């Protein structure tokens, strides 16, 4: 089970976007990376296709999972632990003790 999943609200711990938060769009577990909405935005040169025109577009690049932390209810970063509730393994916020999974 992964500590950070698609749809989670996360906070960036280090790098140029330190302190900013966003929602996880995609997780790449084999590379230990995630794409976060509005974080690590880079400019990409795009070639013209039948559906899209050529130009420079802004796109989110991936961030290493070690630089991300799940945001607690108050928006501050928290570590993630695991607990068994009703025979089901769930994620738990270490800071507040609340269950992250519904």
UniProtKB/Swiss-Prot annotation:
Q: Name one GO biological process term.
A: translation
**Key words of the record:** Ribonucleoprotein, Ribosomal protein, RNA-binding, rRNA-binding
Q: GO CC terms on record?
A: ribonucleoprotein complex; ribosome
Q: Name one GO molecular function term.
A: rRNA binding
Stored InterPro entries: KOW, Rib_uL2_dom2, Ribosomal_uL24, Ribosomal_uL24_CS, Ribosomal_uL24_KOW, Translation_prot_SH3-like_sf
Pfam families linked: KOW, ribosomal_L24
Question: What's this protein's family per the entry?
Answer: Belongs to the universal ribosomal protein uL24 family.
**Stored HAMAP family:** Ribosomal_uL24_B
Function field: One of two assembly initiator proteins, it binds directly to the 5'-end of the 23S rRNA, where it nucleates assembly of the 50S subunit. One of the proteins that surrounds the polypeptide exit tunnel on the outside of the subunit.
What NCBIfam families would the database entry show?
rplX_bact
Task: Describe the subunit structure.
Answer: Part of the 50S ribosomal subunit.
UniProt-recorded name of the protein? Large ribosomal subunit protein uL24
């Amino acid at each position: 089970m992964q500590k950070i999943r698609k749809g989670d609200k996360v906070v960036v711990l280090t790098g140029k976007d330190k302190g900013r938060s966003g929602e996880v769009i995609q997780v790449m577990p084999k590379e230990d990376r995630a794409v976060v909405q509005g974080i690590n935005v880079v400019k990409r040169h795009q070639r013209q296709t039948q559906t899209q025109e050529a130009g420079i577009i802004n796109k989110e690049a991936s961030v290493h999972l070690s630089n991300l932390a799940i945001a607690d209810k108050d928006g501050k970063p928290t570590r993630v632990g695991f607990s068994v509730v009703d025979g089901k393994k769930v994620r738990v916020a270490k800071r507040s003790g609340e269950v992250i999974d519904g």
